Amino acid sequence: AAGEEWVEISPETEEVLRLSKEYAALSEGYFDVTTGPLVSLWNIHNEQGHYPSQAELEQVLPLIDSDDLLVKEGHAFLARKGMVANLGAIAKGYIADQVKELLVAQGVEHAVLNLGRNILLIGDKQEGTAFTIGIQDPNEEEGVLADVVSSTGKSIVTSGIDERYFTYQGKKYHHILDPYTGFPADTGQASVTLLSATSA
C-alpha cells in the first residue's frame, strides 16, 4: 500500500504515529519510524544479521523520511513505494503508558511495571519512600549496574548497544540505526536512560 493508498488505522496507531512524527521533528530526524527498510536490511534481530553493501544502503536511505508519513483522522499514508513504518522504538513505551493508565484507573497506588528496559513507577513504595531502580551497565555482564535511580511515579527507559547486535569481521553492529548514514549510530554512548513522566 506504500505510495499507493491511504490505510485505515486504529485510534491507538494514529496516536503512536502522531507522537512519532513529533519526536522526529524534535530530534531533527534522528528518531524516525520510517526506518523499516533499513531495519529489515540489517536484520539485526537475527544473530547473523546482514552487513549491507553501499549499494543496498543507497537503495533504502531515500525511503526514510517521517515527512513522507502522512496521518489524518483514522488513516495513514506512506508517500513512496517501498517505505515501511517500524514502530519498535515507540510501541513498547506507548503500551506501557496505557497499562499504567489502566492500573491507576483501577485504583493501584504503588507499583513497579517492568517491561524489560521500560520501567514505569506508580506512586512510591507503600511506606512512602522512593523506588530504587538499577540501570544495567551495557559494557558488563547482565546484573552489573552502571547507576541507580531513585524516583516516584516516573518512567525510566534505557536503550543500549548491548540489547541486540551481531558481530561481523570482529566488530559489533547494534540495533540503534542512524537514519542519515544507514549504519548503527556511533555517538560514543553505550546506552542512554531517560527519566520522564511517560514511556512513549
Predicted region positions:
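Mature catalytic core of soluble alpha/beta enzymes
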Residues: 1-200
